[in-house]
Amino acid sequence: MSAAPHLAPGADPAMIRNFCIIAHIDHGKSTLADRMLGVTGVVEARNMRAQYLDRMDIERERGITIKAQNVRLPWRAQDGQDYILHLIDTPGHVDFSYEVSRSLAACEGAVLLVDAAQGIEAQTLANLYLAIENDLTIVPVLNKIDLPAAQPEKYAEEIAAIIGCDPGDVLRVSGKTGQGVPELLNEIVRQVPAPVGNPAGPARAMIFDSVYDIYRGVITYVRVIDGTLTTRDRCLMMSTGASHETLEVGVISPDPHPTGSLSVGEVGYVIPGVKDVRQARVGDTVTTTRNPATEMLGGYRDPLPMVYSGLYPIDGSEYPALREALDKLQLNDAALTYEPETSAALGFGFRCGFLGLLHLEIVRERLEREFNLTLISTAPNVVYRVVMEDLSEVTVTNPSDWPGGKIAEVYEPVVDAMLLLPTDFVGAVMELCQGRRGVLKGMDYLSTDRVELKYTLPLGEIIFDFFDALKSRTRGYASLDYEPAGEQLADLVKVDILLQGETVDAFSAIVHKEKAYSYGVAMTTKLRELIPRQQFEVPIQAAIGSRIIARENIRAIRKDVLAKCYGGDITRKRKLLEKQKEGKKRMKTIGRVEVPQEAFIAALSTDTGKSATSK
């Protein structure tokens, strides 16, 4: 395979087509990519396996794509010419939209893939708008036409109405059987424009992904915009100004093949001899020290964390291992941020920032699976901006940082949410959104039986169990997509949980004033069941500042001190009972309640478990 013409360096840009596939989860994107690998012959039938491009175990198990992948495909089109197609496989999930935006910037065209049995979903629409913003050519395709439940005519009209094409132009393929895939590849060659760039100018390439390899350091996946990158040049990262020796340059088809150089329009990999992934940031521009470019490629923003959660090792001695594991994960995941923090209840750990709940869950699962750590994560929360009465500002990512004293106003992040659902469920979903302090912004009927609702919702209301509630109210038919939309003034308070009069920081939460009471009652009731009974009565209280809003008591265990008395004088028994009473009284004033680790895990996991399983 290495001698194949499509792997030769220095391809003519006019013969290159760079495209990506936009689809919702489960619409068959990875399966279609598998068929393309088979049809173009880069993977022999005997080596084929399902979801060939999804390398991580978690990706295969959940059937989702997390990291963007790319592969170089040779294709002889109808005109008899040999073309080179670069497929950049993108994730479909809302949490990984920054991966999508980078992949789109590396393409000229996008295949809009829609399940012929389900129709367009919210995330497909969101990514479609992103692609249109980036001026990509859209090739509409209906997948899974072999399904008995497929309704290609109906959904072709729906797609045509949204992107403004003729329903007859919507291609019909089956990723499972391979039907229609050669026609799709021919359409990509015909419709997607060839890449343009200056082959003689200074080299400029955009990093759209990077992975960490234990033997060779950071491997960056790049799309060359201008000039040529070769192994002879030292490469220069424009955002950091650091230069490195280029160890290897090549293409992926679908396994890496060194070619020695990459020229205009080509997609491949560059291995700069870097051990620290922060030196090779995704979205950065690579140039050469010999003939450096003067300006960076635009359009990249650092991904900002939306959700914060504390990660703590259950065994305190695993703290250094957790730090090392997070360092390694950050090499692959530019959006993960973390800083050390301590908790009186949970010991040493890290406050981590994530893009959303699925991101949080996947990072946690990778830490546990790839690094053999056992972790406990605190309830997720968002970033609040608190303005004090003296006009000083405090940014709060952790409930324990909530300032005391006089607070003038609190701002919370809001999102513009787009919900797609069957018309039968509009009432139930509107009721749900209003209960979550949502404001209706608009309502569009895509067809007679599908409606798109636009809401502005506080992010803090979505990250708990909103997705679960939405799915259960619509029998699983609704889909959700959201994007940040600034912040709004909110009436928020911090609810503390007190055990025996002492605050337990791990259970504190920032909630809306109207929901503070129900949170307090739920938490105190749950802890009463989880904390073992003591020799003395333990009050569990929920408080806002110094005002108690809910209380439960853990009843004391009574030891039978009269067991050893057989008959005898009543005063003897009374003396023992009085002595026990005194002891209990003293214990109540000086006794401490030890919350067992299991109770912490159960309380926090049931609190966040509703949301963690939601996606």
From Swiss-Prot:
Entry keyword set: Cell membrane, GTP-binding, Hydrolase, Membrane, Nucleotide-binding, Protein biosynthesis
Keyword Transport tagged: no
GO CC, any one term: plasma membrane
Cross-referenced Gene3D superfamilies: 3.30.70.240, Elongation factor 4, C-terminal domain, Elongation Factor G (Translational Gtpase), domain 3, P-loop containing nucleotide triphosphate hydrolases, Translation factors
Function: Required for accurate and efficient protein synthesis under certain stress conditions. May act as a fidelity factor of the translation reaction, by catalyzing a one-codon backward translocation of tRNAs on improperly translocated ribosomes. Back-translocation proceeds from a post-translocation (POST) complex to a pre-translocation (PRE) complex, thus giving elongation factor G a second chance to translocate the tRNAs correctly. Binds to ribosomes in a GTP-dependent manner.
Name of the gene this protein is made from: lepA
Enzyme Commission no: 3.6.5.n1
BP term (GO), one: positive regulation of translation
Topology of this chain in the membrane: Peripheral membrane protein
Name listed for the protein in its UniProt record: Elongation factor 4
Domain tr-type G intervals: 14-196
Matches recorded under SUPFAM superfamilies: EF-G C-terminal domain-like (SSF54980), P-loop containing nucleoside triphosphate hydrolases (SSF52540), Translation proteins (SSF50447)
Domain of life the protein comes from: Bacteria
GO molecular function: GTP binding; GTPase activity; ribosome binding; translation elongation factor activity
